[in-house]
Amino acid sequence: EVGASTGAEPANAQSRGPQYGAGPNVDRCNCPLIQREDQFQGVNSWTKIFGNHSIKFGADLRYARNLRVPSDNDRTGILYFSNQPTSNGSTGGLGFATFALGEVTGFRRYVSTSTNAKEFQKRDFFYGQDTWRVTSKLTVNYGLRYEFYFPETINAKGNGALLDPATGYLNVAGVGGVASNMNWGRNNNTYSPRIGVAYQIYPTTVIRGGYGRSFDIGVFGSIFGHAATQNLPVLSNQEITATGGYLSSAFTLAQGPPAPTPIPVPSNGLLPNPGYAVNSRARPNPLRLPTLDAWNVSVQQSLTPTLSLTIAYVGNKGTHTLGDGSANTTNPNETAVFLPAQYSITGQE
């Protein structure tokens, strides 16, 4: 990317010089992207009617698989040319001139040790419900659903890792005492009750009300995919910037970028998080599921044989639904908390 604004990377200001490139800021392309996700599923339900009861129960068994090899930062590398090396100290300069001199001010690329790191997850659901016609005017529907979301597993030793926020270590799957599920636990409190009531007060008036709870897997990466195989030691997001002042460069085009530094995995499978220089992906342990509680009450009045009026109150409450944000902030617009090394369990910032 060639740009005119200050800093190691151009911010694409159009005030000075040409702006062009193939990186995240100009015409972003996650290329090449290898993505294959599928799911095997078996579902069945049974119904039994006796008296004024209609009972249903069933099961939904799923097995999900995912392979994702991303290139958000191109695997051949993204070169950045800012105006600084051709500036007069902190003013002036031209990104295109920096490019002509071959002075690279920033560099990013994705480096993978495996292009076959896959994730698997079992999801099992069971339910039972009863529609009970109590009287000719009163009907009650009640039921319970239970959902099993197992922690995802990785297909091979060292093909995935998750950052444990409680320890500061990346749990590397299949290494040492770390299991293929990275020693993650599942949420056992996944009961989903449902109840609904309909009562006919008068021949032309009916009151209805209900409540239900449901769970979800969230956005891609919340509890499955797009996390474990996007961490070290599988994926390294290499980033190099100029550190020698306004007129310095990270390297020249003639030199080329340095090779990424290999990250050895300790024999116990606990890889210390490399610090703020690496954006490691984490999940709560045990898994935390997005939850929705919903309720409603309504009154339906028949006005004529062909016209009715319904007044309703509908409410819902979502819990743990935030898809992307720093867990360390009270305000989503604040920056993340910086933890000094002396207070870190790993001794790192």
Predicted segment positions?
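Short acidic-glycine motifs
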Residues: 1-349
